[in-house]
A protein has these predicted regions:
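Cytosolic/nucleoplasmic, non-transmembrane interface domains of endomembrane
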Residues: 1-170
Length: 170
């Protein structure tokens, strides 16, 4: 029991709370953000992923606008409160620590730290996707002309993609 408690205590509570939220598959019901969906049916004509991953693979729903506003905010507060109450018993803390965990200010600060962990992961997800998306490589004049037409048209996949990214990240 002591070794398990020591192992748990070695991870910050906010990390353990965020980990629990992920294990609960929070946001799994929210569609992932994908280049294919965001850029529309012409996406494969203008985009590719440097990693070779398909354009249909993207950001988990948890890390979208709806994931944050419709799932994370309320779930984070609830799971933080629950785990803060469980924490003293799980780790075998003395009574004064129990009282501190029940303090509203401490709970608010802990919720803020959980939000920070979420946002750090959010940024990593988005940076990884955006760094991986690039324009297709056109190796002849005909392909370059077609690429330019697709990019400059009224329903440009590039414009659609950028608008969708802005919508999801602001």
């Amino acid at each position: 029991v002591q070794s398990v408690r020591a192992l748990l205590a070695s991870y910050p509570l906010e990390q353990r709370i965020f980990s629990r939220l992920r294990r609960q598959r929070l946001g799994a019901d929210i569609p992932a953000f994908t280049v294919a969906t965001a850029a529309g049916p012409s996406a494969p004509l203008v985009f590719e992923r440097a990693s070779g991953k398909p354009l249909t693979e993207g950001i988990p729903g948890l890390f979208t606008y709806d994931g944050y506003h419709k799932r994370f905010q309320s779930a984070a507060a609830a799971v933080t409160a629950t785990m803060a109450l469980e924490e003293p018993w799980v780790l075998g803390l003395e009574r004064s620590a129990v009282d501190r965990m029940r303090d509203a200010a401490a709970l608010g600060a802990l919720t803020d730290r959980v939000r920070r962990v979420y946002l750090e992961n959010y940024v990593k997800e988005w940076e990884a996707l955006l760094a991986d998306v690039r324009l297709v490589r056109a190796n002849d004049l005909e392909k370059n002309i077609q690429l330019a037409r697709n990019l400059s048209g009224g329903s440009s996949p590039l414009a659609s993609f950028v608008r969708a990214v802005v919508r999801e990240t602001t």
